[in-house]
Amino acid sequence: AGVHARGQTASVVLHGKAEDGFFTEKVNKLLPPDIRIREAGLEKNGFHARKSAVGKRYVYQIDTDEKPDVFDRRYTYHFPKKLDIAAMQQAAELLTGTHEFAAYTDKKDETSTKRTIYAIMVGGQGGRINIQYEGTGFLYHMVRILTGTLLEVGMGTRRIESVTIALEAKDRTKAGFLAPARGLFLDEVYYKEKSWRE
């Protein structure tokens, strides 16, 4: 399974007015069962689902139990290791803020690798760990590489301060492994900056 989305957004330009419920009822009937339009609304001219966004929230789900959950295995990364959550949280704190994230992308020809991460929250219960990322935007594979890096910190195979060394070096080989796509969810796209930074 690839990356999932609970809060994917899209925009279309209509010639004329769509009747109420057109997208949430009529279009939903034509979509496959794993895709659903939950809400639709009108926006001002010039709105673009991707270009008008001011931020995004991603969640990465990890299953640390010895055996993978048969129901959730397509939506979590099975990683049966004992993790130091406090160390992961300390490393996450070093990654927040505005930085050059060249070490945390697999795309070499990015025009700019500067991004702002407002928060990385690491937590969980039992065998389930969630890592939540909130920022202005993310580079190609960035969230998955950040996740792999934090998991290495949690295992004790990577020092906490190494996450900063990777940032400064701008060298992909200094960062952690690429975590699999199946644990990653686009949780929400933000269009009003104040509402999600407070």
List where the protein language model places each region.
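Structured-RNA-binding interfaces characteristic of tRNA pseudouridine synthases
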Residues: 1-198
